[in-house]
C-alpha cells in the first residue's frame, strides 16, 4: 500500500489546477486502430488526386467521424451526404443530398456505422473509394461518453472544483481526457484490492465508531475478503446483491469464512432503488450505526443513494460510490450526495486497476473509478 501511494507522489507536484475547459478545446482523437493502408489511401486520394472527403448520413457516428477524420488524418470533411436534404449543415459541415451531388465527382467516402451498403448507392452515380472506419471508431471511442462529455463540457469544466486534493483533480482530468482522445488512461491508478478501503482507512477516525458496513453490489464477496485481509473490522456487514446466480456463489464463499466472521454478515438478494419492488436501504433493520457504504451496481447508484438518505443524514458514513457506469455519473452522484447532506461531505476521486491490470499495466479508462464522500 505504501509503495503504491509513493509511486504517485510524482503527480502531486505537477500543477495546482487542471484546465478542463482547455482540454475540451484542444483534445485530439488519437488513432489506435485505423489500418495504415486505409489511412494512407485516404490522405493520398484527398490531397493528391482531388477526391472529395465525405460521410454518408447525418448520424451520431458521423458527428464523431467529423472530428475523428480531422484529428487522425488531418482531413476536413467536405460534405455530409443524405437521402433527402432537410438542413444546410451538420456540425459545421455542409449537408447535401445524393441528387444534389454532382455526377462524376470523385468521392472519398468514410463509413462509421456499417453503412457501406448505403454508401455503395452513391457509387452508382459517382466514382468513389470507401474507407471503412467502423471498427477503428468502435475501438477508439466510447461513443455515449464522448458525446455526453462534449455536450456538457461546461458542466464538466466546473465540476473539477469539488475536488481539493491534487490526485483527485489529476484523476478527473486524465479520466475525461482518455474518453476525448481514445487514448489509455494515464493518471494515478491504485491496486484494485484497495478499492473502497484506502480512503476509508485514512479517514475512518472521523467516522463515528466504525460499526456497520453496507456492501452494495457484493457480487461473489471478493470485497469482503479483501476487507478481512487488511484487518478492517465491522460489527455487521450487509452484503447486498441483486443477481441470484451471484448470490449462490457469494453464499458459498461466505461459508468458507470463520464462524466469527461469517456470523457478522447478512446476505440480501434484492435490487436497491426507488421502485416498489426494490429494497430501500432506509428500510434495513440496522443493529448498529453505519460507517461505510460502498456501491457498484451498474448504474443504479443515484437511486440507491436516494433510498438511503435517512441513513446518510443520521450516521454520516463514508461513501465509496462507483462513478463509471453512466456518462453523467461524475455530475449526478456528487450532486445527489450534496443534496442529501448539504455542505457536510468533501469529495475524493480515485482510479483503480482491474483484475486484468497486470496485462495492461493497470491502465484502464472505462472502469474502477470511485467517488468518495468523506465527512468534513
Per-range role (PLM):
Residues 93, 107, 263-266:
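Short, conserved active-site loop motifs that form the nucleotide-linked donor/cofactor pocket
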Residues 78-84, 237-241, 318-322:
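Short internal beta-strands
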Residues 1-54, 58-73, 86-88, 102-233, 243-287, ...:
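S-adenosyl-L-methionine
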Residues 134, 318-358:
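C-terminal substrate-binding/active-site "lid" region of AdoMet-derived donor-dependent transferases
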Residues 96-105, 201-206, 278-287, 310:
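Short amphipathic alpha-helix with an adjacent loop that forms part of the alpha/beta core around
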Residues 210-223, 268-334:
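Active-site segment flanking the S-adenosylmethionine/decSAM binding pocket
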Residues 73-75, 128, 232-233, 257-262, ...:
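Short helix-capping segments at alpha-helix termini
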Amino acid at each position: 500500500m505504501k509503495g503504491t501511494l509513493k509511486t504517485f507522489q510524482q503527480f502531486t507536484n505537477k500543477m495546482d489546477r487542471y484546465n478542463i475547459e482547455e482540454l475540451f478545446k484542444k483534445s485530439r482523437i488519437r488513432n489506435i486502430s485505423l489500418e495504415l493502408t486505409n489511412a494512407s489511401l485516404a490522405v493520398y486520394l484527398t490531397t493528391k488526386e482531388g477526391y472529395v472527403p465525405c460521410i454518408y448520413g447525418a448520424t451520431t457516428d458521423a458527428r464523431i467521424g467529423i472530428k475523428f477524420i480531422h484529428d487522425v488524418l488531418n482531413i476536413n470533411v467536405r460534405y455530409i451526404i443524405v437521402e433527402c436534404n432537410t438542413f444546410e449543415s451538420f456540425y459545421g459541415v455542409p449537408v447535401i443530398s445524393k441528387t444534389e451531388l454532382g455526377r462524376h465527382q470523385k468521392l472519398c467516402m468514410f463509413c462509421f456505422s456499417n453503412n457501406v451498403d448505403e454508401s455503395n448507392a452513391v457509387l452508382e452515380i459517382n466514382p468513389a473509394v470507401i474507407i471503412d472506419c467502423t471498427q477503428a471508431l468502435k475501438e477508439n471511442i466510447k461513443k455515449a461518453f464522448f458525446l455526453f462529455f462534449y455536450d456538457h463540457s461546461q458542466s464538466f469544466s466546473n465540476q473539477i472544483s469539488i475536488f481539493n486534493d491534487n490526485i483527485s483533480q489529476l484523476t478527473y482530468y486524465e479520466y475525461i481526457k482518455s474518453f476525448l482522445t481514445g487514448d489509455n488512461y494515464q493518471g494515478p491508478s491504485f491496486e484494485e484490492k484497495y478499492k473502497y478501503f484506502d480512503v476509508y482507512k485514512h479517514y475512518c477516525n472521523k467516522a463515528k465508531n466504525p460499526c456497520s458496513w453496507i456492501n452494495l453490489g457484493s457480487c461473489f464477496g471478493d470485497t469482503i475478503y479483501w476487507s478481512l485481509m487488511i484487518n478492517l473490522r465491522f460489527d455487521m456487514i450487509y452484503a447486498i446483491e441483486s443477481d441470484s446466480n451471484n448470490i449462490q456463489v457469494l453464499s458459498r464463499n461466505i461459508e468458507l469464512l470463520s464462524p466469527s466472521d461469517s456470523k457478522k454478515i447478512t446476505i440480501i438478494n434484492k435490487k436497491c432503488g426507488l421502485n416498489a419492488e426494490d429494497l430501500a436501504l432506509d428500510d434495513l433493520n440496522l443493529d448498529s450505526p453505519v460507517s461505510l457504504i460502498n456501491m457498484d451496481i451498474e448504474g443504479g447508484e443515484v437511486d440507491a443513494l436516494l433510498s438511503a438518505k435517512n441513513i446518510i443524514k443520521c450516521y454520516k458514513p463514508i461513501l465509496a460510490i462507483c462513478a463509471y457506469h453512466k456518462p453523467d455519473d461524475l455530475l449526478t452522484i456528487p450532486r445527489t450526495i450534496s443534496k442529501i447532506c448539504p455542505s457536510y461531505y468533501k469529495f475524493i476521486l480515485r482510479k483503480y486497476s482491474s483484475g486484468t491490470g497486470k496485462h495492461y499495466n493497470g491502465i484502464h479508462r472505462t472502469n474502477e473509478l470511485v467517488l468518495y464522500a468523506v465527512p468534513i
